Structure formats: C-alpha cells, structure tokens
C-alpha cells in the first residue's frame, strides 16, 4: 500500500510512475474524492463541536429552571446530521481505501522502464550450457523413463497440473529441498521456520495477494461470523512475512532472515494453455522461500544479497543460469524492484524462471502495520520487506534431470546432493 500522504501531495508524480507499470490512475476521480473527504471531515467536526457546545448548555439551562425541550430537540437534530455525515465520510474513505489497495507499488528508480518481459534487462550469466553428443530428452520423458514421474495417476487422483513422484526421483526431489535449507541456514544466516499452509484473509491482504488476486488462490473455507476465510498459501512469503504483522520489533532484532520449505498452491487462473505438460507450472509445488525484514536504509543491499543467495544454490548445483532485472511493466504487484533468475533447460533450449527476488520496500509493511522502534528517537517506523525463491524445488528438479541426463536415460547426481542421496552418484 502506498503512503497516503505521498499520494495526496504527489498525485501527478505517483500517476506518472504507476503508468510505467501499465496502471492508469484516475487523477480527476481521486482529486474529487479528496475534496469530498475534506469537506465531509470539516462538516463532521463542525457538527460535533456544535452538538457538544449546545449539550453543555442543557445543564446550565436546567440549573436556571428553564425549559430544555427545544435545546434537546436541537441536539437530537444535530446528532442525526452528524450521523449522516459520518456515514457519508465512511463511504468516501472506504472508496479511497479500495483504490489505494488496488494500486501496485511504485517502481524503484533503478528499475528499467518497459512494457513487458521483452524489455527486461539481463545483468549477468553464470555457467556454460552443456553440449550433448546424443539426442536429449525433456524432463517428462526422463522422469517417466525412470518410473519416477507419474502424471497419469495424478490426473486420476486429482486432475491436471499435479504430479505423483516415486522412487529415486522422489528422493532426489526431497534432497534438493533439504540441500537448499541447509545452505541458507548454515551459510546465509537464515532461521528455518515451519509455517501453516492455510492462512487467513488478513495475512493475504498484508502481503498483497488480496483483494486483487483472489482468483489465483485455492480458498478452503469461506468467511463466517465466527472468523475469517482460509486459503492455501501460494508461497511461504505469506506466513513468513506476516510474522511481523501488527508488531513493533526492536531495531536490534534486525535484520530478520527467515526460510521455509513448503508446498505452495496456485490456481494458475491466468495461465490457461501455458506449460500444460510437465512440472513447470503445477497447481501444487514445493518451494524454499527466503524472507528478509530490514531497516529501510538496508533494503537495497539486502536485495542484492538475497539474490546472491538464490544464485549460490544454482552455482553449487552446477546449473547454468542468467539473472535479469524486471522492467516496470513486468514486475509483481507489490515489488519496487525485482531480479528474476532463469535456469538453462536444454530440452527447451532456453532459460526459464526459477527464482524471483523482490524488494517490497514499505508496501507490505504499511498494509500489515509492521514497524520497528528506531533507537535514535524511540519512535516506530515502517519496516522494509523482501522475499525470494531459494529455489522452486520442482523446477530445480527439472533442470537437474535435463542438464545431468546421460545417453542411457540415467541421471548423474550433482555432487552436493550425493550426501542426501545416500552416496548415490546416479539414478537409473
């Protein structure tokens, strides 16, 4: 959520910056609402003051033995007018808030301006794609050949975009997640967390999935008088970041660095016809998430570090990748600056996204009222939040199967994963 004061004082600047993201802000309508808000605020305060003043005169009139019926009627009339103005004001504030909640974050000045993914800017590459001396297979054929990927039974049990993994492929998938967690906790300074896979509406509002992206979620329980609705998490970013919702943390506690390995659930409502085969785009998938909660002045350096942590996973696995900075038109809703890391997939002869690392600045913190107490003046200030995949486990499995395949369909196990595989050097 954007800073309301900045929005009011710098409306045209805000509109210009949001336009680079493809979001058109109706300046005239917002200006009209702001003028109406001010007018109603003044009217409400004046009515309140008048009612209070006249109410005080009732006691004085009674003390003098005067009839107060007319004064009581006047107070009642002012009360009715006040209630009506309060209802009008609440409606205006609700509309302003709805508009504010629909606005994406302002892009950082260092983010390249562009309309879509074709205008993202590559910043570096690592590794050289392998040259094969035999016809290569994609991860689907490789996984099925190893009797490790069972799409048919997944469809029978649940439906499309799900997977059953078995045997050494399932073990390899587990090993990948364990390796990532161990790396982040022992070398990168993250604390491992185990979090709920179901979250309430307040949590999804806090991190920005609601109200705009409700159709992308799997909702399991509707809201009732007894409580909020529950939805399956689309990413562990939601529960991890919400750990500081409605909190004021001490400055000495920062930075807070958390990681979790969870299943994630997405309806892929806007992805009809994309990646319909294989593991690239599933309704349920595993991901190791990294979250950092930092002081505002530290967030840009934290983004570089967090992106480096995700890249280190690929380097240790020996998987070629490239890192791109997303242009304004391709960034996620809550992001001010994002790096995407794309791993090389030989069967597709291209790089595909395997991690997205973003600095949200105070966008989520304002929605969550997540603050820290500044030691210098002992006053609370909004935190900055960052998140990134470290990495998507299923896509990492895809990359390993394809990059480490052998002519006979077997898969060489990357060296760093062998301790997690009981010392195996290959499967198949």
Curated annotation (Swiss-Prot):
Ligand binding (L-serine): 235-237, 289, 389
Protein name: Serine--tRNA ligase
Gene Ontology CC: cytoplasm
Catalysed reactions, as listed in the record: tRNA(Ser) + L-serine + ATP = L-seryl-tRNA(Ser) + AMP + diphosphate + H(+); tRNA(Sec) + L-serine + ATP = L-seryl-tRNA(Sec) + AMP + diphosphate + H(+)
Residues where ATP binds: 266-268, 353-356
Keywords carried by this UniProt record: Aminoacyl-tRNA synthetase, ATP-binding, Cytoplasm, Ligase, Nucleotide-binding, Protein biosynthesis
Pfam families reported for this sequence: Seryl_tRNA_N (PF02403), tRNA-synt_2b (PF00587)
Record text about domains: Consists of two distinct domains, a catalytic core and a N-terminal extension that is involved in tRNA binding.
EC id: 6.1.1.11
Record organism: Shewanella baltica (strain OS185)
UniProt family annotation: Belongs to the class-II aminoacyl-tRNA synthetase family. Type-1 seryl-tRNA synthetase subfamily.
């Amino acid at each position: 959520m954007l800073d309301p004061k900045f929005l009011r004082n710098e409306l045209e600047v805000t509109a210009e910056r949001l336009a680079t993201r493809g979001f058109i802000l109706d300046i005239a309508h917002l200006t009209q609402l702001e003028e109406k808000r001010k007018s109603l605020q003044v009217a409400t305060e004046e009515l309140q003051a008048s009612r209070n003043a006249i109410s005080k005169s009732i006691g004085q009139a009674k003390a003098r033995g005067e009839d107060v019926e007319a004064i009581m009627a006047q107070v009642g009339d002012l009360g009715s007018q006040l209630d009506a103005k309060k209802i009008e004001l609440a409606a205006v504030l609700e509309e302003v808030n709805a508009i504010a909640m629909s606005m994406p974050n302002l892009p950082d000045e260092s983010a390249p301006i562009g309309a879509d993914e074709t205008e993202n800017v590559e910043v570096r590459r690592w590794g050289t794609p392998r040259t094969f001396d035999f016809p290569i297979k994609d991860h689907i054929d490789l996984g099925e050949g190893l009797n490790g990927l069972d799409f048919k039974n997944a469809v029978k049990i649940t439906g499309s975009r799900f997977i059953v993994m078995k045997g050494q492929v399932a073990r390899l998938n587990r090993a990948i997640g364990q390796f990532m967690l161990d790396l982040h906790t022992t070398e990168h300074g993250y604390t491992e967390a185990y979090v709920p896979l179901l979250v309430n509406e307040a949590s999804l509002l806090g991190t920005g999935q609601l109200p705009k992206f409700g159709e992308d979620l799997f909702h399991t329980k509707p809201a009732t008088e007894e409580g909020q609705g529950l939805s399956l998490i689309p990413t562990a970013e939601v529960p991890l970041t919400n750990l500081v919702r409605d909190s004021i943390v001490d400055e000495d506690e920062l930075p807070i660095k958390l990681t979790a390995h969870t299943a994630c659930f997405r309806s892929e409502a806007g992805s009809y016809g994309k990646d319909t085969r294989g593991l690239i785009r599933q309704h349920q998938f595993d991901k190791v998430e990294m979250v950092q909660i930092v002081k505002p002045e530290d967030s840009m350096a934290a983004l570089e570090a967090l992106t480096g942590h995700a890249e280190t996973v690929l380097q240790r696995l020996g998987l070629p990748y490239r890192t791109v900075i997303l242009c304004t038109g391709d960034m996620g809703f809550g992001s001010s600056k994002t790096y995407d890391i794309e791993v090389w997939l030989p069967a597709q002869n291209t790089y595909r996204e395997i991690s997205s690392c973003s600095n949200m600045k105070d966008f989520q913190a304002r929605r969550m009222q997540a603050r820290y107490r500044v030691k210098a003046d002992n006053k609370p200030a909004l935190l900055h939040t960052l998140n990134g995949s470290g990495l998507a486990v299923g896509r990492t499995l895809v990359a390993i199967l394809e990059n480490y395949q052998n002519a006979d369909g077997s898969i060489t196990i990357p060296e760093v994963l062998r301790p997690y595989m009981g010392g195996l050097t290959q499967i198949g």
